[in-house]
Amino acid sequence: VPSRRTTSRLAAVAVLGAAGAIAPLSSSQAAEPSAPTSAQPQTVQRLQAAGLASTIKLDNCSGSLVRYPTSTDTDKAMLLTNGHCYEGGFLSAGEVLVNKASSRSGQLLDDAGSSIGTVQATKVLYATMIGNDVALYELTDTYADIASSTGAKALTISDSKPADQSAISIPSSYWGKTYSCSINGFVGELREGDWTWHDSIRYAFPNPDCETIHGTSGSPIVDNTSLEVVGINNTGNDDGQQCTVNNPCEVNEDGTTTATQGQNYGQQTYWFTTCLTDNAIDLSKDGCLLTKPATATKPHGPKKPH
């Protein structure tokens, strides 16, 4: 069984030799939780661009071909998935990968879910399961190269936090299926096993169109209006347990916890855009929300031509 959507499903991911887990984040990155509204199952119209086009099927997870709002066609293209999907195994609590060599590959899909080519990574630009659950890879080809050979255009990572109650689609390349629902608030602290995430995206529940499963880990969360990536799918409560692996819980301000069996979550991706200098990740930039490694880090990633 492939890894679930997130770090949850750690056991399942471990069987595959994939990475998956949750991790603590600095208190400065914590966001105020928002209570879920009364959830009524709802039908969300799926837009054409919210299909499987520009998603990337990995051997253990889902992923997508992405770009920053400021990326140029001559920049090296990027692959986005979960930190727990890292090919080297689970990242430990406290671990941050920066500019690490990688040779993983994936199948780039069209809107119908058919493979239109193979993409190859050269390095992990950034990956962590501390406070967030993300892995961003640099690929061998530029956006222009990929567009020329396959016709695929990368999804744009939004530079702002998604709006509560906004309609979303979650295209899973692993399963060739798109889930649709809406955002139902944000969780200041979401805990699962040894890991903690902040400002997590809570999906509308109950909603049969948004029951993400193992293998949907790393799927982009696409806003149905802007058609931009506003988050990344990563976990859900399987059994109704509190704060255990595959059973994330919401931690309230007073320290009490709540958990709902079947409730699914995603993580923020606009954080990447708070850390860009000259179109490269700069963890030292003021206001950067991404978790920093223990040692100082200099900018890395695709550079904007001067």
Regions found by a protein language model. Name each.
Residues V1-E32:
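Secretory targeting and sorting signals
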Residues S26-A50, I281-H306:
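Composition-driven, intrinsically disordered low-complexity tracts enriched in small residues
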Residues A35-A53, K57, R67-S71, E87, ...:
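Conserved catalytic-core segment of clan PA serine endopeptidases
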Residues Q45, A50-L52, K57-C61, A144-K153, ...:
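Active-site region of chymotrypsin-like
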Residues Q48-A53, P162-P171:
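Short coil-to-beta transition motif at edge beta-strands of beta-rich domains
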Residues L58-N60, T74-K76, L80, A101, ...:
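Extracytoplasmic
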Residues T70-S71, A77-T81, D223-V230:
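Short, glycine-anchored, charge-dense loop/turn motifs used at functional sites
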Residues S114-K123, D164-A167, G176-D194:
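Beta-strand/loop subdomains of soluble extracytoplasmic proteins
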